[in-house]
């Protein structure tokens, strides 16, 4: 009976009503459940009207024929109750026949079966994939300080032709080694690092910032930007070491992957601090708010910076989830077409797992319309990064070629951005 009551109700989709206003049964004043047979009624009056019409019942009022029907007395006078049903617009034409009820039941069952089949075929994030996502999220959070507090350890930014109040004035004591940051243990020397000879000791030792002057002059921002990039390299090494499967690679392949991808991952990560409002990277205070002019004062030109800003804008507009962002960084690092790799098949298998996880995550967790072609757009961003990487390499070589500039770079930069692949 409950099924028939549900299936013989017709919801009038053309009738709009305020959802905040209580819906009252037009027959007895009880709480209404919707439009039934063309009128707003409760379940009780709906069933009463349907039964009365099907039985073609004839009722007689034992009183004066004008009984006031309420929730409490609606069973006392069926005649006045039925009259009230008709008065508020309930129509027997809206009642389905037994054949119509059967057809509707079949349609509902068919729809439920189709929905169940569709749900069973919907991609689901496996336990293994979820574990991978969780590991990458933890790795990212351990190696990305959203407070940017370590930026105070860099050689200070010296900006030409800017308000002098924006410049940092700091005694040389800030360049001495202080207490390590919360996640610095990620980068300290470990048995694994010595076993594999991973880059040089500088990659795993506590990063020490040079006290080399931040005097105004040619490429005045280069010392600060060099420290920022070196710091970012340290963080990305820590992130890469925690990618599932990365440590399964031989040391030479780990080094080759990082040397080839690190600038691309820096560009990816920097998108978190990029603002569409003023096209700048804000890393905490105003002193660490970087615009294109700042990077030109570190030796780079618009051949790199114009497409870089375009890349940052496009990536920001994708509105990636943090899960998608960390997976994209891992996919970028684990690229089997990097130069100097010995076991490309293993790198490819790790990247395939990451890519599959990203596609599944998008299907399961990223609602439309944002998910439309999202995976393809993200992969295109990796292709854009290759072009940016190539241009960065050209400009870096020009900067590092001159001794007066290369002396402002860090040993880590000189090692990582060298053309030598082990």
Swiss-Prot record:
Record's keyword annotation contains 4Fe-4S: no
Tissue expr: Detected in all tissues examined. Highest level in small intestine and skin.
One Gene Ontology MF term: nuclear receptor activity
Annotated ranges, domain NR LBD: 128-418
Residues where Zn(2+) 1 binds: 25, 28, 42, 45
Residue span of region Disordered: 170-191
Region feature (Interaction with coactivator LXXLL motif): 241-259
Positions of calcitriol binding: 232, 269, 273, 300, 392
Record-annotated membrane-spanning stretches: none
GO cellular component, one term: nucleus
InterPro entries: DBD_VDR, NHR-like_dom_sf, Nucl_hrmn_rcpt_lig-bd, Nuclear_hormone_rcpt_NR1, Nuclear_hrmn_rcpt, VitD_rcpt, Znf_hrmn_rcpt, Znf_NHR/GATA
Regions recorded as binding DNA: 22-90
Keywords: Cytoplasm, DNA-binding, Metal-binding, Nucleus, Receptor, Transcription, Transcription regulation, Zinc, Zinc-finger
Matches recorded under SMART domains: HOLI, ZnF_C4
Residues at which Zn(2+) 2 binds: 61, 67, 77, 80
Position of sequence motif 9aaTAD: 411-419
Segments for region (Hinge): 98-127
GO BP term (any one): negative regulation of transcription by RNA polymerase II
Annotated zinc fingers (NR C4-type), start-end: 25-45, 61-85
Top-rank taxon: Eukaryota
Pfam family, one: zf-C4
Subunit structure: Homodimer in the absence of bound vitamin D3. Heterodimer with RXRA after vitamin D3 binding.
Domain notes: Composed of three domains: a modulating N-terminal domain, a DNA-binding domain and a C-terminal ligand-binding domain. The 9aaTAD motif is a transactivation domain present in a large number of yeast and animal transcription factors.
Function text: Nuclear receptor for calcitriol, the active form of vitamin D3 which mediates the action of this vitamin on cells. Enters the nucleus upon vitamin D3 binding where it forms heterodimers with the retinoid X receptor/RXR. The VDR-RXR heterodimers bind to specific response elements on DNA and activate the transcription of vitamin D3-responsive target genes. Plays a central role in calcium homeostasis. Also functions as a receptor for the secondary bile acid lithocholic acid (LCA) and its metabolites.
Descriptive protein name: Vitamin D3 receptor
The species this protein was found in: Xenopus laevis
